[in-house]
């Protein structure tokens, strides 16, 4: 009787599971196999129009299917300059269905733009890839499996003359911050920036006396771009450095306007970095930027420092940014102290090489979704997340680091990160890991078993202040080229098991404070050669725990060095260090 009841229960459970089908792993019978092109489509569009069309991607599609289609757009009914933008509206699609700019299952397709000069053959073809990611948990998948799936293509075309704006920012000390409103006379006191194509409020005479400037990239372009300031009615108190008296400074709203969509300059470095540094103090009052889809970044190659020190920005909508040509994103959001979130899901980073300090000191960012970042060409990730002390989660599982040479300070100060999966990191070309994990004090575990450190020269402070790490297996580390291990594990107060059995120290010259305040340390290290010249404070304030111990294996020529290292420990703890000649 019990067996019969059990059988009935199992059958009922099976029926419930089959009829609900809400789990990702239930798709066992619908793994995709289609790989191919859906077709070629030609759009003959007129200027100043919106064209919409559904494209059939196929029937009987299943998770993990992928494919592509070509779109050809023709704007041959005008002799004027013209441009078009193409986007895909994601409606009535599975949650895991992606449109991509490359056949890599990663690089998102957001928008595509093309600009034609008057005499051009106004024809453009773009290939769009698609992929149904079956790893995305979606309870509605079953309503799409085996059905026809379509892409809704929207093309906006417009006859125009490009309205390119200049970048008046300057690092020249004699330029006082830059020209026009980028000058330190104005930019620290800009409160809001608004892009618009409404010129009705433009001063009748556009000159500096009226706080108005022609900021067109070229004085010969037909479509002009203007920037003008309007008093917000708000003021701030500031100390006049020349008289030491307190003065009230007016705050302004900046409007950047043109008849047509404003095009960003190729080099947009620090273009919205509206601050000045004076009397050992940063002054910045920018609280919002509203692009209104009137800031076209399709030709931008550098966004370095674009929002540098926008310390009062709490929100930033850059979802319409076209980053397909961008090469440099270093310091892009550095010191955006009050940003709590950033939507970068539409960013195409396939050409980016420099992400140095990209999110440096974004202290209030709690989460950052970079799952669509293509980092295959990035060489510099130094200080990329340095100072992101509120980040609690960071998924870098899709990061391709095969070309990265610099990871200095990469996670320094990410003090709220409890876990970090770097199992997919390729570090074969990295030459510096200086302070890479410094002050990651919430990390309890760190698996670096796949790290290739054969080219690393500096591991200075690499794990310093990782106060919650208790175990660290570095048995696969190749340290043959490392010269600097200064404070490598300093203040790792919880670190007990540390496997350094295969450490090659033959080229190391600096081990200053290497195990400073490692109270619970249990490890064994081998010292060979005579290259180590600085081992001061190596075991200072360390080995206080009753179970702590260190074994120093040394070659005959390194005997005096080993003895000197032992002497750096507190006198009462030197007995916990054993010297063994090899």
Regions found by a protein language model. Give the residues of each.
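C-terminal, structured domain-capping segment
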Residues: 65-82, 121-162, 268, 515
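Negatively charged
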Residues: 161-582
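Surface-exposed interaction patch
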Residues: 17-18, 27, 61-108
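Generic structural detector for well-ordered beta-strands
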Residues: 35-37, 44, 60, 72-74, ...
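A structural detector for beta-sheet-dominated domains
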Residues: 37-39, 44-48, 58, 74-76, ...
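Short, polar/proline-rich extracytoplasmic segments that appear immediately after membrane translocation
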Residues: 2-62, 145-147, 154-162
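Strand-loop-strand motifs at the edges of beta-sheets in extracellular beta-sandwich domains
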Residues: 109, 124-130, 250-255
């Amino acid at each position: 009787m019990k067996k019969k009841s059990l059988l009935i229960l199992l059958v009922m459970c099976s029926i419930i599971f089959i009829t609900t089908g809400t789990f990702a792993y239930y798709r066992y019978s619908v793994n995709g196999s289609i790989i191919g092109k859906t077709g070629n489509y030609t759009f003959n569009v007129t200027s100043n129009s919106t064209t919409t069309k559904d494209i059939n991607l196929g029937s009987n599609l299943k998770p993990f299917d992928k494919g592509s289609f070509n779109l050809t757009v023709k704007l041959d009914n005008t002799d004027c300059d013209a441009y078009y933008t193409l986007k895909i509206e994601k409606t009535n699609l599975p949650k895991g269905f992606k449109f991509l700019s490359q056949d890599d299952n990663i690089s998102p397709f957001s928008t595509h733009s093309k600009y034609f000069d008057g005499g051009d053959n106004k024809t453009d073809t773009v290939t769009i890839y698609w992929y149904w990611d079956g790893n995305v948990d979606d309870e509605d998948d079953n309503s799409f499996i085996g059905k026809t799936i379509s892409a809704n293509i929207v093309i906006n075309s417009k006859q125009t003359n490009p309205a390119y704006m200049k970048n008046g920012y300057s690092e020249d000390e004699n330029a006082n911050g830059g020209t026009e409103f980028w000058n330190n006379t104005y930019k620290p006191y800009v409160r809001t920036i608004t892009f618009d194509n409404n010129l009705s409020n433009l001063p009748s005479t556009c000159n500096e006396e009226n706080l108005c400037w022609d900021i067109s990239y070229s004085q010969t372009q037909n479509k002009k771009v203007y920037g003008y300031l309007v008093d917000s009615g708000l003021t701030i108190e500031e100390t006049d450095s020349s008289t030491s008296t307190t003065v009230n400074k007016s705050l302004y709203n900046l409007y950047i306007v043109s008849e047509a969509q404003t095009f960003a300059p190729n080099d947009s470095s620090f273009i919205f970095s509206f601050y000045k540094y004076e009397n050992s103090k940063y002054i910045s009052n920018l609280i919002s930027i509203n692009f209104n889809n009137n800031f076209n970044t399709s030709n931008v190659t550098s966004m370095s420092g674009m929002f540098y020190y926008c310390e009062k920005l709490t929100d930033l909508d850059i979802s319409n940014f076209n980053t397909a040509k961008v090469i440099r994103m270093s310091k892009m959001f550095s010191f955006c102290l009050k940003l709590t979130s950033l939507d970068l899901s539409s960013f195409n980073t396939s050409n980016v090489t420099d992400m140095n300090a990209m999110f440096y000191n974004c202290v209030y960012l709690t989460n950052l979704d970079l799952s669509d970042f293509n980092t295959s060409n990035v060489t510099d990730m130094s200080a990329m997340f340095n100072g992101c002390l509120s980040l609690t989660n960071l998924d870098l599982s899709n990061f391709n680091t095969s070309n990265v040479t610099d990871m200095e300070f990469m996670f320094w100060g990410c003090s709220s990160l409890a876990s970090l999966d770097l199992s997919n990191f390729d570090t074969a070309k990295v030459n510096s890991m200086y302070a890479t994990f410094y002050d990651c004090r919430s990390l309890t575990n760190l698996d670096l078993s796949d790290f290739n450190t054969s080219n690393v020269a500096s591991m200075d402070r690499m794990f310093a202040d990782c106060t919650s790490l208790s175990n660290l297996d570095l048995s696969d580390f190749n340290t043959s080229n490392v010269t600097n291990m200064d404070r490598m594990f300093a203040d790792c107060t919880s670190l007990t098991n540390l496997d350094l059995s295969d450490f090659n120290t033959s080229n190391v010259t600096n081990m200053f404070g290497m195990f400073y305040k490692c109270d619970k340390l249990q490890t064994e290290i081998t010292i060979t050669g005579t290259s180590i010249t600085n081992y001061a404070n190596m075991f200072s304030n360390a080995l206080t725990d009753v179970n702590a111990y260190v074994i120093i294996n040394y070659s005959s020529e390194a005997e005096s060095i080993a003895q000197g290292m032992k002497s750096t420990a507190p006198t009462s703890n030197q007995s916990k260090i054993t010297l063994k000649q090899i």
